[in-house]
Amino acid sequence: MLILGVGYFLLGLILLYYGSDWFVLGSERIARHFNVSNFVIGATVMAIGTSLPEILTSAYASYMHAPGISIGNAIGSCICNIGLVLGLSAIISPIIVDKNLQKNILVYLLFVIFAAVIGIDGFSWIDGVVLLILFIIYLRWTVKNGSAEIEENNDKNNPSVVFSLVLLIIGLIGVLVGAELFVDGAKKIALALDISDKVIGFTLVAFGTSLPELMVSLAAAKRNLGGMVLGNVIGSNIADIGGALAVGSLFMHLPAENVQMAVLVIMSLLLYLFAKYSKIGRWQGILFLALYIIAIASLRMG
């Protein structure tokens, strides 16, 4: 099992690395072709694509009458996206935040606060429908109000949109399959080393559903595509709440997770306050990363 686990682990890592790079490259070229900003692509196409694991996991968990896993996966992934994904991305490449991005972050913050308020007593199917509708409205608003910052000489030399779309799809498949193999391989290694199921579930499964966002955002950060990173994080969080959590609540009532929601609100508020200064730099990234580690340690101790 150990050898098989190492093989899955390494193959998953390779697919994650190249898949995320192709996904970002295809997304960037499509953004230029359709004259939309990197943020819009990040908040829509990339966010929905990388949030598929969370949406499917939460929906299936609710269907199988495991509400704690359903809501924990959705909210935990949101915390991971800000603390780990955005934190590491900002450390690699500081993110410049213009007025338009600040407005998007404010909308995101209000969405999170609204979700926290209606979820004080848990999430019913009515709450799920409301969040799902707000998610759809957000997507339309983002696309409609997104303004691109395109250089004039980019259009002529770009490959065709079909090639870019194929690159995007292959990259997304690589990321999703790679994440599954990576986590499965890590589980096999852990079991072979007699690590408990509880530790495996708490660490690897929770981290695994956020791997697509992490790898895609790091690939974008290496290309200095800060808007795409921010769009992916914000869009993924809205998709996790308005998609994963909302769909999960349609199958059964989800319990309140006020501590996790409070952590998410605080981290989202810090994100907005940092963005007001027009830059999320390395020190902010280190702070987000530290807060994520503290939050995970506190939740585990609780």
Curated annotation (Swiss-Prot):
Q: Name one GO molecular function term.
A: calcium, potassium:sodium antiporter activity
Q: Which domain of life is it from?
A: Archaea
Entry's Gene Ontology cellular component terms: plasma membrane
Can you say what this protein is called? Uncharacterized membrane protein MJ0091
- What topology in the membrane does the UniProt record assign? Multi-pass membrane protein
**Organism whose genome encodes this protein:** Methanocaldococcus jannaschii (strain ATCC 43067 / DSM 2661 / JAL-1 / JCM 10045 / NBRC 100440) (Methanococcus jannaschii)
Q: Report keywords, A-Z.
A: Cell membrane, Membrane, Transmembrane, Transmembrane helix
GO biological process assignments: calcium ion transmembrane transport; intracellular calcium ion homeostasis
- What's the family? Belongs to the Ca(2+):cation antiporter (CaCA) (TC 2.A.19) family.
Q: Carries keyword Lipid metabolism?
A: no
Does the record's keyword annotation contain Cell membrane? Answer: yes
Which InterPro entries has this protein been placed in? K/Na/Ca-exchanger (IPR004481), NaCa_Exmemb (IPR004837), NCX_ion-bd_dom_sf (IPR044880)
Its annotated compartments are:
Cell membrane
Q: Which residue ranges does UniProt annotate as crossing the membrane?
A: 3-23, 39-59, 77-97, 106-126, 128-148, 163-183, 199-219, 227-247, 254-274
